[in-house]
A protein has these predicted regions:
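C-terminal functional module detector
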Residues: 1-10, 14, 200-204, 209-308
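A metal-dependent hydrolase metal-coordination microenvironment
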Residues: 2-148, 152, 159-161, 166-168, ...
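Alpha-helical membrane segments in multi-pass integral membrane proteins
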Residues: 170-172, 296
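Short, well-ordered alpha-helical segments in soluble proteins
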Residues: 174-180, 197-200, 242-245
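Short, hydrophobic/aliphatic alpha-helical segments
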Residues: 188-202
Length: 308
């Protein structure tokens, strides 16, 4: 009998989540309550409000069928940030505990500061500069302080290989940020993601919409396979990579059996398997039909299946 290795958790329900969102607390156009209602209307169950350089616990907005995560987007700009095409690091920190309001330093904000949020924030004393060493120091400190660290939209940030090649300790990276194409650059970051993987990093791929206004709602997301909709359960699933990203298709099951990768999904025209090299496998729907399942033989180009 061939052993079966499931690549997605076998749980009763997956929860739709967005982990990169802005409100009127920073430079968004909608209040936190309006943001939540917008996502809830689209079938989301998890939302992380990640306002710029400002961290807030939104647990008071939780409902039995909707969970708010605590997070912040950190911006570290190059000295020439006023110029077109200048570089910037944007990193999201997602707190493993809802009341963890640590922030690495007091950073520049170009919007009104809420004094109540300011009093509750636990500021660190890091000196943040635009350099890989400085960012790595922040990532290490954020991991130590109980956060998951996500690297945001490097293509939109005009970053190149030397800016990200040495980054260590990342939990995730935006493979797709659908707001970027609306404000001046490519929404996809596939090349950067492959570079990080090829260096031996385990970094999970994220889909987000980086919502600042209603036009951005619901363009890209992740589906989280957690046993229940609680803060601890969702964070544990995120830590382990028990989720997948999507801009539309749903994956019902994904597993390896008998040297073959098998998938069951919602309607798709094409299913691709890409690898770290120049080898791929494609299954394409025929005669204007839809694909709802596929299998790909792995024996020619996968040496082994990792167990961890």
């Amino acid at each position: 009998m061939n052993a079966v290795k499931h690549l997605l958790p076998q749980v009763p329900q997956y929860f739709k989540a967005n982990l990169h969102t802005h409100s009127t607390i920073s430079d968004g156009k909608l209040t936190p309550e309006e943001v939540k209602e917008g996502y809830k209307a689209l079938g989301y169950q998890i939302l992380c409000l990640t306002d710029h350089n400002t961290i807030v616990n939104h647990s008071d907005m939780n409902e039995p069928d909707f969970l708010m995560l605590t997070g912040i987007e950190i911006n570290i700009n190059a000295p020439d940030m006023t110029k077109v095409g200048s570089k910037t690091y944007h990193m999201i920190l997602i707190a493993k505990e809802p009341d963890n309001l640590w922030c690495p330093a007091k950073l520049h904000r170009w919007f009104p500061i809420n004094e109540e949020y300011e009093r509750k924030t636990q500021y660190g004393d890091l000196v943040l500069q635009y350099s890989p060493d400085s960012i790595n120091n922040m990532i290490a400190k954020a991991n130590e302080k109980g956060f998951l660290v996500m690297y945001n939209h490097p293509t939109w940030s005009c970053q190149t290989y030397p800016d990200y090649a040495g980054l260590k300790g990342l939990w995730g990276m935006e493979l797709r940020n659908t707001e970027c194409c609306m404000i001046g650059h490519d929404e996809n970051n596939f090349r950067v993601y492959r570079d990080l993987l090829n260096q031996g990093n385990r970094v999970y791929p994220l889909g987000t919409d980086d919502m600042h206004n209603r036009r951005s709602l619901g363009k890209s997301w992740i589906m989280v396979g957690a046993p229940e909709l609680s803060y601890g359960s969702v964070i544990e699933a995120l830590k382990k990579g028990d989720f997948y990203m999507s801009c539309g298709p749903e994956i019902m099951d994904l597993w390896i059996e008998g040297g073959k990768l098998k998938v069951i999904c919602s309607d798709a025209k094409r299913i691709n398997l890409e690898t770290h090299g120049r080898i791929a496998r494609n299954v394409i729907a025929k005669d204007n039909n839809w694909l709802r399942e596929a299998e790909v033989d792995l024996t020619d180009f996968i040496d082994k299946v990792k167990e961890d």
